[in-house]
Regions:
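Alpha-helical protein-protein interaction scaffolds
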Residues: 4-237
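Residue-identity detector for threonine
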Residues: 2-4, 63, 74, 93, ...
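N-terminal leader/linker segments that initiate helical-solenoid repeat arrays
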Residues: 1-22, 304-322
Length: 374
């Protein structure tokens, strides 16, 4: 039995890492033709079959050849467990992984992989024994045992991210949010760019009570700088950006209300309405509070946003329909407000029509799109 790793096997392993599986298989086939007793070559051949083709039977055949040469090779046993799962024999993996732990009781990976699969195996067995229903007590017992295995994996491999990932999944399945949050922090200490943990922590912070849209968008933009490929955080940034855009409709409606007040649009009992048309000075003065509203409510807020958030706002308008609808509604309401205040009307009928047209076209969808993310 070959004791050391042959250079050809090392090259094949690198090819597999690069997802060049066919080239790796060709290299391993030549190596096994030279030395059919190379255990590592058989193991890497199994790994290549699990890469692109997910061919469980071929991977299983390769691991069986490796184990026939050395039944105590833990690397071959671990790959054999993966091959069994790919071949549809998932329930058999428990015994294989327990053998891995027996042979290497001080190595973390066997504990972590068994913890990751054990609760699933027990759920399948419980379902098979109970007419397709997983009993709650069986699930709880499986999660407890899996949690103990995960903690042992962490103890043996305190710097191994996978052990913490498994422990997080088990805590999440058990509904233990406190432990899950603590494990997320541990994962991020080891890997500050871990996409899933970063996305979960960011979402928790962004959706906390009292966090407004601008703050949420900033949190997501900062997190995306560390993990730019994260789809959940990109979606979260889009959602927060859309919430920011929705706010401009309220600014436009406020300006519409100011326009109505400026022209005394609706008569009130005991109060004489202004004579129309309003003088030019008054009409120009009516623009001042509108300018203040947009300066304080939109322009200054926009300038304070992170560059990434500003870029995403523009991108969202190009990519999504509802943000464009929101912008169009705000523009329509503002157009109505300007028409009401800047044309020297001699009668209030048309301004009233403009007021209701600007108001109803916007208010009609505000409640409807509250839950939309753009």
């Amino acid at each position: 039995v070959t004791a050391t790793v042959h250079p050809a096997v090392e090259r094949a392993d690198l090819l597999i890492d690069l997802k060049r599986y066919e080239e790796a298989r060709e290299l391993l086939a030549r190596r096994l033709a030279e030395d059919p007793e190379d255990v590592r070559a058989w193991v890497k051949l199994a790994r290549s079959h699990l890469g692109d083709e997910k061919d469980g039977p071929k991977a299983l055949e390769a691991t069986e050849r490796a184990l026939a040469l050395d039944s105590a090779d833990t690397g071959a046993l671990v790959m054999h467990a993966h091959a069994l799962r790919a071949a549809g024999r998932f329930l058999e993996t428990e015994d294989v992984l327990r053998e891995v732990i027996r042979l290497a009781p001080d190595h973390w990976y066997g504990y972590a992989l068994l913890a990751n699969w054990l609760w699933r195996i027990r759920a399948i067995r419980s379902g098979q024994a109970n007419g397709g229903q997983v009993r709650r007590e069986d699930q709880d017992a499986a999660l407890r045992e899996a949690g103990e295995l995960a903690q042992e994996a962490i103890r043996l491999g305190p710097e191994e991210v996978f052990a913490y990932e498994v422990a997080w999944l088990i805590a999440d399945m058990a509904g233990n949010r406190t432990v899950a949050d603590r494990l997320d922090e541990a994962i991020l200490r080891l890997d500050p760019q871990h996409e899933q943990a970063l996305a979960r922590r960011t979402k928790k912070a962004a959706t906390a009570p009292g966090v407004n849209a601008a703050q949420a968008a900033t949190l997501y933009a900062d997190a995306l700088a560390a993990a730019p490929g994260s789809a959940p955080m990109r979606s979260g940034l889009d959602d927060a950006s859309y919430r920011l855009l929705r706010g401009i409709r309220w600014l436009a409606l406020l300006c519409l209300a100011l326009a109505g007040v400026g022209i005394d649009l609706f008569a009130t009992e005991g109060r004489t309405q202004r004579e129309l048309p309003l003088p030019l000075g008054q009409r120009l003065w009516d623009l001042v509070p509108m300018a203040v509203v947009w300066t304080l409510g939109a322009l200054l807020r926009y300038r304070r946003l992170r560059a990434g958030v500003r870029v995403n706002l523009r991108s969202l308008l190009r990519r999504r329909t509802w943000p464009r609808i929101v912008l169009a509604q705000a523009s329509w309401a503002m157009a109505c407000a300007l028409l009401i205040t800047q044309i020297p009307w001699t009668d209030r009928t048309v301004p009233q029509v403009l007021f209701w047209a600007g108001l109803l076209a916007t208010v009609a969808t505000i409640w409807f799109d509250r839950r939309k993310n753009g």
